[in-house]
Amino acid sequence: MSGIRVCIDTNVFLNVLNRESVFYQDSKEVLNAVDLGTLEAVIPTLVIAEILTGFYTDNKDDKAEQFLSTIISNKNIEVVQLSIEIAASSAVIRAKTGMRLPDAMVMSTALHEKVDYMVTNDRNFPDSFQGLRSIKSAELAKLL
């Protein structure tokens, strides 16, 4: 499985951070596989902003800094900033699919980075878009 590149949606991180029983174990396996280098992860800056917002809303600034430090220091994670190309593609995806703009931005980033899978537990993501397959953390965990 080495060399598999995935784009990870916000909810996969939140499943682990919030210990959400339905998705916790499989999402944790996916994130552990990134830590071990079994998977290479692409993380849009939007995902980081969404996660940090939760920490700051709950006045957990120390947890926010810890999360950010972990993301930045992980050599198996590539953080991708929103570019003009990704923004324009996001608008097209939103217009064609009706996805919420943040989801379209994550999908656009995944397409731009030519990842193998878009990992999300969001049932509103299309199963496939422009050749990119969306996969649930449970399905990916079985492949690891």
What are these regions (language model features)?
Residues V12, V47-I48, I86, M105-V106, ...:
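Alpha-helix capping/helix-boundary segments
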Residues L46, E50-L52, Y56-E78:
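Active-site-proximal, substrate-binding regions of enzyme catalytic domains
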Residues M1-R5, M107, H112-L144:
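Acidic, PIN/NYN-like endoribonuclease modules and their adjacent C-terminal/linker elements
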Residues L14-V16, E50-T53, S89-S90:
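A short acidic, helix-capping loop that chelates divalent metal ions and anchors anionic groups
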Residues M1-I43, Y56-Q66, L140-L144:
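Short, well-structured N-terminal submotif of metal-dependent ribonuclease cores
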Residues E78-Y117, N121:
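Active-site neighborhoods of divalent-metal-dependent phosphate/nucleic-acid chemistry enzymes
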Residues L39, I77, L132:
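Short, conserved active-site loop motifs that form the nucleotide-linked donor/cofactor pocket
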